[in-house]
């Protein structure tokens, strides 16, 4: 634990907590986190470019609900373009959730759909496609046997 870590079950309080050197097979890295606990991943910059290591790290795992990148902004944008996540920030955390005008949601195993503002309404709505056909004429080529199919193909 780098900082934080205090909790109080009676008041349901969990202090925002930063954790470093978390094993990649730890539940903190393999399960969704519903609390102010942030595992940090540090990648060395030897060998392949750092940006490529980040992209490889992200794309070799399940798509994250959120992706937070700290580093050069231009590299951050390239990494975001080449990876997939629900949302994210460059050189910040949480702000994509805090803004009610910015949709938030997951992709892949971290969920489907977005919420906040109009997206909340859409997420809990069901849009149906309905086709209404008039009864004044019922074209026989819709039904078997399809004898008139050749004629329809010629017309089209």
Residue ranges and their predicted role:
Residues 14-156:
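Conserved C-terminal structural/oligomerization subdomain of aldehyde/semialdehyde dehydrogenase
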Residues 1-5, 68-69:
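Short beta-strand segments
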Residues 4-9, 93-94:
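Short, solvent-exposed loop/turn elements at beta->coil junctions and helix N-caps
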